[in-house]
Amino acid sequence: MNGPQHPLTGIRVLEMGSRVAAPYVGKLLADAGADVCKVESPAGDPFRRWSASGATIPMGGDAAWFRFLNGGKRSAVVDLGVDGGRDELLHLVAGADLVIDDHDPADARALGITADDLRAVNPAVVVATLTPFGTTGPWADRPANDFVLQALVGSTEVRGMPGEEPVSVGGDLGDFTAAAFAAPAALSATLAARASGHGAHVDCSQYEAMMHSFQVFRPMYESMAPDYEFPRQFMIPSIEPASDGMVALCCVTGQQWQDFCAMIGAPEFGDDPMFLSFIGRLERKEEVWERIHAFTKAHTVDEIVEVASAFRIPCGPVGDGLTLPGYDHFVERGVFVDHPQGFIGPRPSIGFSESTLAPRRPAPSLGDAGDEPDDGPGPVLGTDPARPLAGVRILDLGTFWAGPVAASFLRVLGADLVKVESHVRLDGMRWAAGYQRDHLWEWSPGYHGANPGKTLVTLDLTTDAGQEVLGTLLDTADVVIENFSPRVMDSWGVTWDAVRRRNPRAVYLRAPAFGLDGPWRDRVGFAMTMEQVGGLANRTGHPDGPRLLPQGPVDMFAAMHAAVAVLLALADRERTGTGQLIEAPLIEAALQASAEQVVEASAYGNVLGCLGNRSAAATPQGLYRTAEDDRWLAVSIETDAQWANLQGLVDGLDDLDRHGDADRIDEVLGAWSRGQAGRESEERLWQAGVPAAFCVHPNHSGGTAQHEFRGFLQWYEHPVTGSTPYFSYPFLVDGARLSLGGPAPTLGQHTDQVLESLGLDEAAIARLREQGVTDDWPVGIPRP
């Protein structure tokens, strides 16, 4: 072996992809030390010449954004359109551990490079396909992209002002989300296949990934509360005017709203039940904004952030490509680093106490395959690509979304899991139902979706007895996961030093909002805060309107990066025998998805902003009113062939230039769409080969023919909510779903079972209940 040892040293990856999603999977693996060879046509990845800001790329050079996504890889040119091209590709596949492929299923079949074709050459290889709908099902061959999929999953429909044109999320966030889910799925299968010699097809669907990330498991409402359907909305407070700029504010919990109202001098708003919900504030937005702005406009951003932080209200500055690298927190932590090809970008979002990631390296020129590394055998983990973590024990101390979702994903890969939750202060996601029910804490789709199949024990960790039980659980855990602000684990004594002393083999994942050190260390923050501060909101909204929030994708995005980190640490433990600390801050995951803004600003001096529903990569693209009241149709044209298909369907487009006549095209499409029923026009456009979708409400996004065919919803009987649909993770392994294992647990459901497994007898468990150390009912709520 030559060169330094990284977690994936010895893993050989063939990347057959362009644009963002597949290359970002390859980037994550290359950052961890894998040898990633990018297969390109003679023309090269189109992103070699792509700049979202329209910057001129010098002849013979490559775009900075391409270089960010492809640093550290090799490049091989294969022309699949000529005789012998397929044989060249299959020769490369024969030496690979993993193939990442984003070819459309129809193209893969026509070229003879389906997963089955590739595995026939190399039965030990894992083929991870990453396509809009997956490679199976009635929609597998339909054209779609990030914009269209946002409409299909219900994200677009509910973002913006009621009665006005809704708005999609900008900045390719759906592509990043799909990549984030595909990476740990492909990596875990590859590590197991290398041990067993049996490969697999990991069939990833961007549609399913965005169901997870761009809504909060909303189809559950159809069974839990069929009459509850929230309107188009935006958060209040959110991005608000200060005296010297814009400030980011976020109130998710009732306590945060009451504290915010006290801060701005409007305590009566905090006491009014009308304003406890986002919807209530939106209904009286002018009145609420008047009070908010009277405070914010009288203070600077720094002044507001200082006092809001003291109140434990999520807050921060509003970031963009120019400002992000200069924030003191990122400077002190070394978040933004120089790229060897002349720009800056964020470092990888995960850090290790023992493992070493690969250094920043240049992207290859077209066809620069370099020298194949001689890296030795490489890591292994498990033996079954569908259950590579069988036998691994996870202790889930997480709350809300990012930590619990990372733990849930790893459990579905075969791990045993125990979730610890306090009955004194419940996981905050339990209170996010949005409607009133008896046993309200059992009715939140957000909690259900993040915690299916988990074994749950309740413990008050502020007590000595609770700490003693936790210590026993720590002694046998392979992985410990938490995502509180650092001070919480410090107060419970669950520091890295303490965990390591008890259990040197433990992998301890910590995923706080802003990291374990730095000026913002103790600030609280949700996914929406990361979107505001980290630049994602800067790409979302109409050009002449307020910046809006993606509203949640960062949690899932960060959770999947955390899952990758745990897999890397477990694989390293197979080699070293010891565990380690992982730091995976929520904000640094968000910065990966907004990295294009920093790259464009540092490379070309251009600041990216909001385009509304238009796109620099697709034209025409927009939302168009249908014949139905306030219902919209999404259309996005990326190729000349798709434009020709649209011209063949809609009269009046023949003499228009798709790049130069955007306004006139919008007029023609708008007039056509207003005469159409949404579902019918969607079907007509799809049949004509045009990427399009009717904007659905997220509550109604689950019952599609594609989801039914691929078994996306897994139904389980919950003790309180009854028959409940849960989202599968967005991939199939050799055509099969990974089982979620059951419904989300009720509060304290498995406490006796867990305590008995630790050796406590019936009398000892009864004493813990009498002392209030454990319970199956929330403290402070009267029992019926």
Label each residue range with its predicted role.
Residues 166-177, 201, 231-237, 246-248, ...:
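A short glycine-threonine-serine/GTX helix/turn-capping micro-motif
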Residues 189-228, 317, 321, 569-612, ...:
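Substrate-binding/catalytic subdomain of NAD(P)-dependent oxidoreductase enzymes
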Residues 271-281, 319-328, 343, 656-669, ...:
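Short linear loop/turn motifs
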Residues 305, 310-360, 687-741, 780:
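A glycine-rich dinucleotide-binding beta-alpha-beta segment and adjacent secondary-structure elements
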